[in-house]
Amino acid sequence: MFREKVELKELEQMDPEYRDLLTRVVTIQADCEIGGPHLYAKDILPSAPTKTDQLLVARTASEELDHYRKIARVAGDFGVDVSFVLSWTNQERYLEAFRGTINTWEDFAVFGFLIDRVGRYQLEEFFGCSYQPLTDILPIIIKEEIGHVGYGESKTAELAAKGEESREKVQAALDRWYVKALDMFGRSDSTRDQRYIYWGLKRRTNAQARQEFIREVDPLIGKLGLRVPDPIQGRQYL
């Protein structure tokens, strides 16, 4: 198990596998950060029910863009240009959760509640990771991501409490996004995640992180008076 800390100036001397895995993980993370605003900003921002909601949507999108910039800067410092993801269509995104569009507030709220929560899990993998420049940018990013999750959770609760029709719409959104959230963790039998762990770039296997997410989010869904969706039906990666 690799336990050293790697600074930018030392990266060229690292094993090619380490550099390849680092390149992959920052590229996917950059795509995830930009993917969210591409999904919802066009339709959700102008349809916000209140000025406060509109402000919070705008701030969320702005912070996600800044997260992309921070990740892109880390990548650029070691010669990797991730700017190509800026011009990708949604259907070209690395992860299924960022393909398509979001044009209802039920979907937007549940996206924040679930998908941004997975984003927090993804970022937590890098806490104390072997590549120091990546660790260094995490505190503010994770703090803001927690805010996005909190807003999504509060809006989900608000919409679920508005009446039967609204609760049914929230449940339908939950059914759509829950399996996408679980799939974001990747395959349980992945061999690549073992290499990430070996090189100190991640702390948990895909299966471990997914189970921790389930243990956290399922009770929250129940507290909202909603039904926990089937964790298998519709999944792409088990």
For each feature predicted by the language model, list its residue ranges.
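A contiguous pocket-lining binding segment that forms or flanks enzyme active sites
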Residues: 130-186
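Alpha-helical transition-metal enzyme core signature, strongest for iron centers
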Residues: 29-37, 60-75, 109-119, 141-152, ...
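Conserved alpha-helical segments that form or flank metal/cofactor-binding pockets of metalloenzymes
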Residues: 54-55, 59-87, 155-159
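Alpha-helical scaffold segments that form or flank carboxylate-/histidine-based iron centers
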Residues: 18-29, 48-66, 108, 132-146, ...
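Extended, helix-rich structural scaffolds rather than catalytic motifs
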Residues: 167-238
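Helix-loop segments that flank and shape redox-cofactor active sites
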Residues: 14-18, 36-59, 119-134
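Active-site-proximal alpha-helical scaffolds that flank and shape metal-associated catalytic sites
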Residues: 80-150
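Acidic/His metal-coordination segments adjacent to aromatic residues that form catalytic metal sites
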Residues: 7-29, 88-112, 129, 162-163, ...
